[in-house]
Amino acid sequence: MHNSGGDGGGGRPVIEVTDLAKAYRVYDKPEGLLASVRGLFRRTSRRVEALRGVDLEVKRGEFLALLGPNGAGKTTFLKLLSGIITPSRGTARVLGHVPWERVDDFRRRFALVMGQRNQLWWDLPAAESFRLHREIYRLDPARFARVRDELVELLGVKQLVLQPVRELSLGERMKLELVAALLHEPEVLFLDEPTIGLDVVAQHTIHDFLREVQATRRVTVILTTHYMKDVAALCERVVVITHGDILYDGSLAEIVDRFTSHKVVTLEFDDPPSSERLAGLGFPCEVRGPQVILRIDRGRIAEVLPRMLQGDGVRDVSVEDVPLEEIVAELFRSTAPPSGREAVEVVT
């Protein structure tokens, strides 16, 4: 079990997941005309387990990052929690509801934003999509207008809402997608790769916006992303999922301490150091012009750093944790797929 407390007020968690699993049947398409004809009568299929029995609890107001390589089961998990698909086994409750029952009360209380799918009408201004959203959710006109104006102001997109969506940049569209998702004031927000393909400025704007929304409205957020800057900027809790299983569930700080035993030391010299000077450092290193990068055990930093600074030519020094991207990538590489995740059978 991977659990994290209950509701901040001592009640039940906002999201409760027990032994949640999802398997798909994928039919192989043979190559060649003859093989394709044979496949009409005798097909080979694979049963792929996207999720293998996940346990998770999320409390109100948490901002949780769900990390994993492509095919790990992240998007499948969000689709299950949103009620888009049904599980092969297991249970889930979001805001007290079983998601795939899709009752109206549940649908009014959550939102899903997928970075590669649009909810805004392509040929219409976003303002028209917002009005449609108001009708679908039967929102009070005055409250709708107030929330819309607050969100538009917060993201700085007032000048964009009357332009056809097809004329906007990717970053501008994503900002308006977030406005649309929050118009009905959901209590739970699922974000699937919301910053994919965005430039740095747009990413920072969305980070600031999500922090403000989460803090002021106490929205519970689950974010999937491949960008570790999203995680560092927004999330206190990290869940790493690989091959359909949860590998790690804990704080962002703990993942650094648990999975790395060293720090990155960067020495900057006035001039590129000689081979003799490098050999005198006593550790394998990477040289980038006047910069020398070393990886040193955490417990030895205080011992070896003064020795490295002896002699002339060292202009600057920095000691940092291993980048989060490297830690997570190593976690992905270190986990082999479990046996039996794919079962092949012949269907006649």
Regions found by a protein language model. Give the residues of each.
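Catalytic Walker B motif of ABC-type/P-loop ATPase nucleotide-binding domains
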Residues: 189-193
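Conserved ABC ATPase signature
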Residues: 123, 164-168
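Short, charged/small-residue-rich alpha-helical element at the C-terminal edge
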Residues: 263-334
